[in-house]
């Protein structure tokens, strides 16, 4: 299984701690090292990392970790890293011809989420999003999290940070297909912003966006200093 890791953004909310954000340390290791190691533990064998802001610094570290881990890792540069994150997924298009994992460089998670997401996902969906139904999860920043409205059959109805009616959170862990890339391109062509969520919305409108409930397992979006402090102090972040 191949994983695409989005690591292109500026990470302005963590800049006072370190830059670029994927190299900010959590428990003695850079964020992106946690993501790569946890994906490896879940059975991922190849990586495509989309870089952008401070790409040279990040790519130097990634070359080191690829050599140390003995894994196949390719970097793809997204010069439009200030644009919505869906364009980083589009940048990886030449290297994803089939189903792939889509991960965020600043999201930490229990590796078993990936294993079960792959094993239990419906084949008729173009995308499956790992969701957290714990609306009181103390690890979640309610002011920043992407919210999801999930139908009874597990399909996504709506997704976005501004939703007022929702029953789950987006964990930033996806099992995707090239259909997501087509959906993002379609969104841009029709005047949309081209975010991942906008691509998911287009798939959802066709009944092609499903979900996987992670239960009570750990995940956190390390997007600011407060989240970094939570990640440093949670036992599962090793």
Where are the model-predicted features located?
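Conserved beta-strand segments of alpha/beta enzyme cores
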Residues: 22, 72-74, 155, 208-210
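Phosphate- and divalent-cation-binding pockets in alpha/beta enzyme and binding domains
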Residues: 13, 57-60, 85, 112-113, ...
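Conserved core of the sugar-phosphate nucleotidyltransferase
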Residues: 110-188
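Conserved alpha/beta core of the MobA/IspD/sugar-nucleotide pyrophosphorylase nucleotidyltransferase superfamily
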Residues: 1-3, 167-238
């Amino acid at each position: 299984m191949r994983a695409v890791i989005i690591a292109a953004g500026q990470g302005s909310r963590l800049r006072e701690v370190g830059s670029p954000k994927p190299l900010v340390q959590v428990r003695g290791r850079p964020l992106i090292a946690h993501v790569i190691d946890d994906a490896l533990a879940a059975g991922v064998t190849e990586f495509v990392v989309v870089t952008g802001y401070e790409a040279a610094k990040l790519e130097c570290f990634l070359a080191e970790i690829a050599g140390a881990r003995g894994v196949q890792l390719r970097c793809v540069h997204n010069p439009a890293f200030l644009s919505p994150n869906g364009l980083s997924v589009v940048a990886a298009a030449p290297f994803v011809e089939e189903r792939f994992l889509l991960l965020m460089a600043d999201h930490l998670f229990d590796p078993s989420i990936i294993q079960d997401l792959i094993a239990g996902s419906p084949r008729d969906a173009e995308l499956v999003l790992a969701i957290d139904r714990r609306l009181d999860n103390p690890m979640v920043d309610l002011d920043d999290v992407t919210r999801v409205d999930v139908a009874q059959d597990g399909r996504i109805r709506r997704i976005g940070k501004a939703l007022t009616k929702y029953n789950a959170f987006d964990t930033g862990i996806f099992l995707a297909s090239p259909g997501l890339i087509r959906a993002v391109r379609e969104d841009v062509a029709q005047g949309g912003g081209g975010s991942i969520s906008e691509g998911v919305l287009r798939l959802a409108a066709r009944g092609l966006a499903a979900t996987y409930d992670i239960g009570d397992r750990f995940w956190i979006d390390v997007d600011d200093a407060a989240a970094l402090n939570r990640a440093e102090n949670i036992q599962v972040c090793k």
